Amino acid sequence: MKAIIVLLMVVTSNADRICTGITSSNSPHVVKTATQGEVNVTGVIPLTTTPTKSHFANLKGTKTRGKLCPKCLNCTDLDVALARPKCMGTIPSAKASILHEVKPVTSGCFPIMHDRTKIRQLPNLLRGYEHIRLSTHNVINAETAPGGPYKVGTSGSCPNVTNGNGFFATMAWAVPKNDNNKTATNPLTVEVPYICTEGEDQITVWGFHSDSETQMVKLYGDSKPQKFTSSANGVTTHYVSQIGGFPNQAEDGGLPQSGRIVVDYMVQKSGKTGTITYQRGILLPQKVWCASGRSKVIKGSLPLIGEADCLHEKYGGLNKSKPYYTGEHAKAIGNCPIWVKTPLKLANGTKYRPPAKLLKERGFFGAIAGFLEGGWEGMIAGWHGYTSHGAHGVAVAADLKSTQEAINKITKNLNSLSELEVKNLQRLSGAMDELHNEILELDEKVDDLRADTISSQIELAVLLSNEGIINSEDEHLLALERKLKKMLGPSAVEIGNGCFETKHKCNQTCLDRIAAGTFNAGEFSLPTFDSLNITAASLNDDGLDNHTILLYYSTAASSLAVTLMIAIFIVYMVSRDNVSCSICL
């Protein structure tokens, strides 16, 4: 007879593999890190710019003061500060001021001895205030001051609004009124009251006149050098007048006067009284400046054209495009970039990886190494994502959420650097406020040491930020792997290194849904099986019947079972030392 043996053959299809990974780029940039040195990355954010010189401008969002009195024609800022006749106008309020008169400028009213006093700094002092006004009445009655009575002297080179002889409105030239008091005098003291509104600084201008011996006797009845002292807020200044021997008149503006004046000022804080001790030739204070608020001062040039974020002594008006700049360091005011010594770049992407190459299949399941090295090309919509490999070829999809998290971290680093920038700007601003109180040195002070220190701090912060951004890639990939594992669930087997072998096909559509977080394994085909193949094998009848065949099978099976039992018994007895076994050769 014939016996039929049925062979069942189950054939499964090849599985797809899905891996997490990082994009690849063929145009890497270089950033500096704290511990890894220079690292190639897929993108950068430049943090520095090198400005070019431009004209000065008005600061955006605030009033910028050029000339102290723009409507005072043919007047220097010193003329305005001394209130020369025809130079008395409104000084506009401003948060920023341009120190545009680089060289000391004399007044066209009376020759002033600049080298004997700090008067050249008076316009700079006034520029340092936001609000400035000239008092409406005099602080002292000059005619009845100690040592008087006096008449107020005038000069033909100081014409008033009616073109008559005049003098500075801030001072009264106290000339003895008659011959009876044209005599030498011991030092006299006058008190200077505070007449401004509470909270304002009072800038009181005063001075003294000196001339040749002949003129001194004619005007004051004394040809000897005279002594003068001012005192306010604990600051005391002493002078002794010079008799004759003055510089050539051409050096003092070519004015016709034979004598010279020395002009000074004192700053009286709110409610504080000042004193002036004097002899003959005193220029007593009259109208005073009342000032408040702060206006940042910077050297520059006029006219002011347009608007700018920042005013820089060397580069003029700048519009801030980057937080930092390289080039020439100098004082700047406004919304300015901070000076750093070298160009800085922040990593804006991932560590550069050449295109990945799959390792050869290994083991029973043909597992692949994943992303030990290299990145995946085509991941143009993001930095991190997935790739699948199968009969469909290679599919790549970016994970936007993971990429956004990486971008958020970079943004956080940028914000941290911005906060550092603000803190450093506040420190620089504080330094400038200190300089306001030391206005005499404003023209010269540049704190290069502070700038170097801040530059080093910023550079280190950028290096550490780049280090953190690059090192965080492992965190993003691990999070991505956990996310992928959760989505795939039982429809895939983890094979290591961020890779999974799926029990279903995963083409580009499948991968896109994984990247979007909308993947559902049920929508894709489950493992497929080939149909059962049934093969009938005919056995020729050689005279064996069914009973004979069964007897052969039964005998063979029984013999095998007995042999196994005997072998087990012998091993057991040997292990208990009940049977010994010797092997001789």
From Swiss-Prot:
Cysteines joined through disulfide linkages: C19-C499, C75-C87, C109-C158, C506-C510
Q: Which Gene3D superfamilies match?
A: 3.90.20.10, 3.90.209.20, Hemagglutinin Chain A, Domain 2 (2.10.77.10)
Per the UniProt annotation, where are the glycans attached?
Answer: N40, N74, N160, N181, N319, N348, N507, N533, N546
- Keywords assigned: Disulfide bond, Fusion of virus membrane with host endosomal membrane, Fusion of virus membrane with host membrane, Glycoprotein, Hemagglutinin, Host cell membrane, Host membrane, Host-virus interaction, Lipoprotein, Membrane, Palmitate, Signal, Transmembrane, Transmembrane helix, Viral attachment to host cell, Viral envelope protein, Viral penetration into host cytoplasm, Virion, Virus endocytosis by host, Virus entry into host cell
Kindly state one GO CC term assigned in the UniProt record. membrane
Function recorded in the entry = Binds to sialic acid-containing receptors on the cell surface, bringing about the attachment of the virus particle to the cell. Plays a major role in the determination of host range restriction and virulence. Class I viral fusion protein. Responsible for penetration of the virus into the cell cytoplasm by mediating the fusion of the membrane of the endocytosed virus particle with the endosomal membrane. Low pH in endosomes induce an irreversible conformational change in HA2, releasing the fusion hydrophobic peptide. Several trimers are required to form a competent fusion pore.
What residues show lipidation of type S-palmitoyl cysteine? C581, C584
Q: What is known about its subunit structure?
A: Homotrimer of disulfide-linked HA1-HA2.
What protein is this chain from?
Hemagglutinin
Report the Pfam families cross-referenced here. Answer: Hemagglutinin
Where are the bilayer-spanning segments? 554-574
GO BP annotation list: endocytosis involved in viral entry into host cell; fusion of virus membrane with host endosome membrane; fusion of virus membrane with host plasma membrane; viral budding from plasma membrane; virion attachment to host cell
Q: Which SUPFAM superfamilies match?
A: Influenza hemagglutinin (stalk), Viral protein domain
Which residues are in coiled coils?
none
Source taxonomy: Viruses, Riboviria, Orthornavirae, Negarnaviricota, Polyploviricotina
Query: InterPro entries, per this entry?
Result: Capsid_hemagglutn (IPR008980), Hemagglutn_HA1_a/b_dom_sf (IPR013828), Hemagglutn_influenz_A/B (IPR001364), Hemagglutn_influenz_B (IPR000386)
